[in-house]
Amino acid sequence: MRRTLAALTLAGLAATGIALAQMPTEVPGKPDPKLVVAGTYKIEPLHTQIGFSVVHLGYNPFMGLFSGVSGTLVLDPANPAAAKLDVTIPVDSIYTTVDELTKGLKGADWFDTAKYPTARFVSTAVEVRGTEARISGNLTLHGVTKPITLQARFVGAGNHPMTKAPAVGFEGRSVIKRSDFGVSNGIPFVTDEVNLTITAAFDKA
């Protein structure tokens, strides 16, 4: 058993060494908008997350997370206002640090993920100021579509070290009222306002 564990440990260290050896000597992403390449990008789901927070009982913010996000971003550095964003969120991916709460949020009293398995945001307008943007669009959640606004910030761009393809990353924030989407359970003990924090990675298609 000890020999097996030792062999596995050595194999793991060797694999790690190979992976590290293949990594670039400097961070590939730079906070330089001039590095953004025009084209259609796909969300890189492993490094894209949508966080949310609500205030619980008036005491403190409580946070959760959505993952497995998919979608596309069309960018043209020569005309940034023409950018198009289309994102789909698997609502069933919702996660909190409390297992029973996570299970409950998927149920009919909350997001009812059996009936409404996904949410979707589609941009309708983009206003760019330097490395920041105001993205207006329609969010469909729980079977209801409402206009919302995202405040986005460019983080970095460059060629991905593994695929060698252009990549770009952004972060964004928004505030929505869940009651607007028919998710009113627990108000006011759990706030109606939901703060959204988005971190998104995109690879050129």
Model-derived regions, located:
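Positively charged n-region of N-terminal signal peptides that target proteins for export
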Residues: M1-T4
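Bacterial N-terminal signal peptides
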Residues: A7-G17
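Low-complexity, acidic/polar, glycine-enriched regions of mature
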Residues: L20-A205
